[in-house]
Amino acid sequence: MPAVQFELFTSAFCGPCHQARAAVTEAVRLIPGASLVEHDVVHEAGLAEQLDIRTTPTVVVRSGSGSEVFRAAGAPTVPQVLAAAGRALEA
């Protein structure tokens, strides 16, 4: 598993999802070994329900061991995403 894994939960008609995607994509570009997995909540409804995803966008940040270290509903900024990544690297 990557040192930091970002999961982005989106939907097709979610305006803020574009902002969230841009912020997370920039963070992945800046963090060596980071990865991004995007989930469409319509096509992956079971996973969204299992992880208690209630709104889009939702960003989940996981450490290298797979533990969730941060979750945010809404569109985060790049500095917020980088701060969350720092938590994942410390975990």
Give short role names for the model-derived ranges.
Residues 1-31:
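Local sequence-structure signature of Cys/Sec-based thiol-disulfide redox active-site neighborhoods
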Residues 9, 33, 50-51, 76-79, ...:
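Chalcogenol-based redox active-site neighborhoods
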Residues 51-60:
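Structural micro-motif
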